[in-house]
Amino acid sequence: MIKHIYKHNGTFEFEAGGSIDNLEITYHTSPLGYTRGRKVIWLCHALTADSDPEGTWWPALVGPGKLIDTEKYFVICANVLGSACGSSGPASMNPKTGKPYYFEFPRVTVRDTVRAFDLLRQHLGIEKIDLLIGTSMGGFMSFEWAVTRPGIFGKIFFIATGARVTPWLAGFNAASRMALLADPTFKEHRDLNGGMEGLKAARAIALLTYRCEEGLFKQNEDSDDTVFAGKVGSYYRHQTSKFVKDWDAYSYLYVCDEVDSNNVGRGRGGVAKALSEIESDCTFICMSSDELFPPEDMKPLSALIPGSSYHQIETPYGHDGFLIETSAIADILRPALP
């Protein structure tokens, strides 16, 4: 897929207050541009993923000749606001200072990102999105977008996601925030390397939520001769050291806050009332061992949208199942392709 940057001409107002005049959205598309009448598949990514599903997070499903065929469809994925992966956020340059915004960047909500996505859609001249797929945090965007722009989407897939942040998820975000703030270099923000040790700790907390005991700890059990368990700790140190090469602590704080803003029912009479207004053909896919969006949450959620269907994939990989169980996802997704 090809990388693009959309630069919005005008002031962008944020839901929680503040504005910027230099909004940018990084996005990837199929090599062939959009033309009227071409079938459109729009993917919404997870928390720290980027806008290149073919190259990074869903290569088994997206690409030339793959299920989501980039030569057949106009496939697009845009990066959320606040991210470290290209779209406007705290790591972006503040034109008034010539330095990153850091904490001067307005706080971002799910609704802000969805409004930005819709600006991009209009800029590209897309009147209908035949298939919208939201994975994890991307599902937050999909719920919000479907409610605010009913009639635009043909079919929607909500995968390993929720319509409102739960205390369980918000609690992990609170712990991650505490880890970031415990690093004294985080508040100094002399450069984007501030808060790196805190970011490693925050990411380790998040990793706990992405797998379940069977999928993570049983693969990292120490031998019976080991005095102090260390295998899983070594795994965490390796994963977090890789992560901080691509992410900064400030952007991570902002996307965690964005997750905490997720509530499609806010100001709309609650989640049930909001979802009842969705007009699209909706499918829910849940990972059986997902501890962030478990079956006991996703199945009742699916019942709130008239005519929706629910599928559960049996997996030992927890929330990360949506990245790993691509064959099972493909079997459910294939009949819905435009």
Protein language model regions, located:
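Acidic catalytic loop of the alpha/beta-hydrolase fold
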Residues: 242, 259-263, 288-293
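N-terminal cap/lid subdomain of alpha/beta-hydrolase-fold enzymes
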Residues: 28-95
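Alpha/beta-hydrolase-fold enzymes
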Residues: 152-154, 158-242
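Conserved acidic catalytic loop of the alpha/beta-hydrolase fold
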Residues: 98-100, 104, 111-131
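Catalytic active-site module of serine/aspartate enzymes centered on a nucleophile-bearing elbow/loop
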Residues: 299-300, 307-338
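Short beta-strand/loop motif that positions the catalytic acidic residue
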Residues: 278, 284-286
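Conserved hydrolase catalytic core segment
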Residues: 128-167
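Short alpha-helix in the alpha/beta-hydrolase fold that links the catalytic acid
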Residues: 267-271, 280, 291-303
